[in-house]
Regions:
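Bacterial Sec-dependent N-terminal signal peptides
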Residues: 10-50
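Extracellular/luminal beta-rich ligand-recognition
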Residues: 53-72, 107-190
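Short, well-ordered beta-strand segments enriched in hydrophobic/aromatic residues
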Residues: 56, 94-102, 191-199
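Short N-terminal edge-element motif at the start of the domain
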Residues: 63-89
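A short beta-turn/strand-edge loop motif at beta-sheet boundaries
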Residues: 103-109, 202-207
Length: 250
């Protein structure tokens, strides 16, 4: 071997063993650097992990900070009573919903309608046909169909009615997102069911830090459950109540 070859081999060996000085000023070898951010220790952001898993096991709801969960319970004098309770927990990724249902009232296909008052405004207009006001978008899909519980994967529809009017007016021909595109998922039983709405798929719908939430469940397109609800009166024949206020946990 020539002297030049010996020298080249020695230099290659030295380079392979040479320590690398990272940005933090310490010393480390290449094998200790994070392959993603190139730092030691790793400075990659923590991967998001939802506190709620949509699997029909509701124990993770009990572990939530109760002050972060919005709850509505059926009024004793309500008109539509199939929905007994609804709990809503929202973070920056999901709107999670847990509902308890009177299963005796669910015997056929059961669509869920979820109404979002995106800015939680007190505007008395934009009322749905049951009298809840402030609605901006509708999420509509089934949770019980053809005799079995199914995963909730709704369509997303903008409200197109006149301001200050009580109308059931949605642009169903031009949904913001058609049903079956992964906007939400759900699991559970007829009597107890959880679902999660993926906020990034709301397609341009922006939520204020606190937004309004309403929900109905129907049988053959006739409502049997409504939350929030209230006592039926001559002025409030459907027993509607103001939307539940949900604050996003950031």
């Amino acid at each position: 071997m020539t002297l030049a070859a010996i020298f080249a081999a020695a230099m290659m060996s030295f380079t392979a063993c040479e320590e690398t000085k990272p940005d933090n000023g310490g010393t480390t070898t290449d094998e200790n650097l994070c392959p993603d951010c190139g730092k030691d220790p790793c400075e990659c952001p923590e991967e998001y992990a939802s506190p709620i898993t949509i699997d029909g096991d509701f124990a993770d709801w009990d572990a939530l900070d109760a002050s972060k969960v919005a709850v509505a319970t059926c009024s004793a004098d309500a008109k539509y009573t199939a929905l007994k309770t609804v709990k809503v927990y929202a973070d920056e990724v999901y709107i999670n919903v847990l509902m308890e249902v009177d299963a005796d009232q669910i015997t056929s296909d059961s669509p869920i309608d979820i109404y979002l008052n995106t800015d939680n405004s007190d505007n008395p207009g934009n009322q749905n046909w049951l009298g809840q006001s402030g609605q901006d978008v509708l999420l509509e899909g089934a949770y019980y169909s053809e005799g079995a519980v199914v995963s909730f994967d709704p369509g997303l529809y903008p409200y197109t009615g006149s301001d200050q009017e009580v109308e059931w007016t949605w642009d169903v021909e031009n949904p913001l997102l058609a049903e079956g595109n992964g906007l939400a998922s759900g699991a559970g039983t007829v009597a107890k069911y959880e679902l999660a709405i993926l906020i990034e798929l709301l397609n341009g719908v922006e939520l204020a830090d606190t937004f309004g939430f309403g929900i109905t469940v129907s049988q053959n397109w006739e409502p049997v459950g409504l939350l929030p609800n209230d006592t039926v009166t001559d002025e409030n024949t459907n027993g509607a109540a103001k939307f539940l206020e949900v604050t996003i946990n950031k």
